[in-house]
Amino acid sequence: MIPVVALVGRPNVGKSTLFNRLTRTRDALVADFPGLTRDRKYGRAEVEGQEFIIIDTGGIDGTEDGVETHMAAQSLLAIEEADIVLFMVDARAGLMPADHAIAKHLRGREKATFLVANKTDGVDIDTAIAEFYSLGLGDIYSIAASHGRGVTQLIERVLLPFSGKGEEEVVELTEEEANAAYWAEQEQNEIEMVEEEEDFDPSTLPLKLAIVGKPNVGKSTLTNRILGEERVVVYDMPGTTRDSIYIPMERDGREYILIDTAGVRKRGKITETVEKFSVIKTLQAIEDANVVLLVIDAREGISDQDLSLLGFILNSGRSLVIAVNKWDGMSQEDKERVKEMLDYRLGFVDFARVHFISALHGSGVGNLFDSILEAYDCATRRVNTSLLTRIMHMAEEDHQPPMIRGRRVKMKYAHAGGYNPPIVVIHGNQVTDLPDSYKRYLMNYFRRSLKVMGTPIRIQFKEGANPYADKRNTLTPNQMRKRKRLMAHLKKR
């Protein structure tokens, strides 16, 4: 089984920096603010061929209040989940009371615990780490996570019980044998890549579902309702999720990765540097997702921020499902008013399913996954060229394209140009000059004909040059005789 390593410690000791270095991503927000990581975040990492799962947690400083108490609880849960705990301390800041409190908790757990002194670059290491021996956790491993110094050696040491090294027989190869083995491996890799492309089936991959919306619309409550556990910090204060949290799950035999994002608020209200980071992470999560679940607060209605977020989702070409949350407790009159407003302001995304839910009580949440799967299946469905060309000609017969500069537009054939979102490429003469109204007509015609729901369709137009423009036909003997008779007739005139 792949080992699980948890990073714990006070806020701002460098846990997220180490997480990012090990996972080779920027999935954890990193800046010089205490308390940046509020939830536990999972990542897959590999050091010297040894794979492991790393958990980044919120900091514990012993003075938790409000949401900070929840952060501490998330860190303690991560300790229980882990096989190995890396207890990180700040060599520059020195020993703090919270370090003693965390060490006391760890000593009471039967976990492999390693004391890691970070930020040792530019200091006298022996002097800086000496006081941490009073924590009673044995050897101290000094690293500089921001520069990577000591990180590989640390991970190799903590993973040693899981590596199984020392069992393998070392075989010496000659230079010729090593070269032959290398090129054989490269050839095999190329063959496997081709086979993987031919056999690609999107249903075998985890479906990435990004849950997005303004702050405090109930995204984390919905995530926890779906998961059935308090996995993401939920606290009635806008902005309690500052980072995008990637959470693997399984439902009805299908694998998913839920992405719970920080809320996106009006640009003028984004003041803290950390919140600007969070907006970027939300937009990156949308780009990374297969399906986006946009959560709207029924009691606040559709705001400009919601429409801005919708615009970004559409520009990204992602499949879309809309969840109108906090539907419980509203009067029938208010519900009808909200529905009318949705019809009016969301008419441009009429392809998206809209669900009315209560994330807090669970009503309507189960039905979301029918629409999520429908949207993903429509976005990744393979359609052959003959069917797309037939639909194109049907659309042309039902509504002829307008004349362009006195000439009739000729659409020749259509084929698939990509998936997620579905792209239809139409080839022909003057097709790029078609008016936007006719392009929208074609897009809607393809959508209806293919029964596509939950995902935008993109139509691309290409004009091919005449392949015979610079070539002269080779005439048959019969054609040559006809040509001579025609030329003789023209001369007589």
From Swiss-Prot:
Residues 381-465 form the KH-like domain. CDD domains: EngA1, EngA2. GO terms for molecular function: GTP binding; ribosome binding. It comes from the Bacteria. InterPro entries: G_ENGA, GTP-bd, GTPase_Der, KH_dom-like, KH_dom-like_a/b, P-loop_NTPase, Small_GTP-bd. GO terms for biological process: ribosome biogenesis. Belongs to the TRAFAC class TrmE-Era-EngA-EngB-Septin-like GTPase superfamily. EngA (Der) GTPase family. The lineage of its organism: Bacteria, Pseudomonadati, Pseudomonadota, Gammaproteobacteria, Enterobacterales. It comes from Photorhabdus laumondii subsp. laumondii (strain DSM 15139 / CIP 105565 / TT01) (Photorhabdus luminescens subsp. laumondii). This is GTPase Der. GTP 2 binds at residues 213-220, 260-264, 325-328. HAMAP family: GTPase_Der. Associates with the 50S ribosomal subunit. Residues 3-166, 207-380 form the EngA-type G domain. GTPase that plays an essential role in the late steps of ribosome biogenesis. GTP 1 binds at residues 9-16, 56-60, 118-121. Keywords: GTP-binding, Nucleotide-binding, Repeat, Ribosome biogenesis.
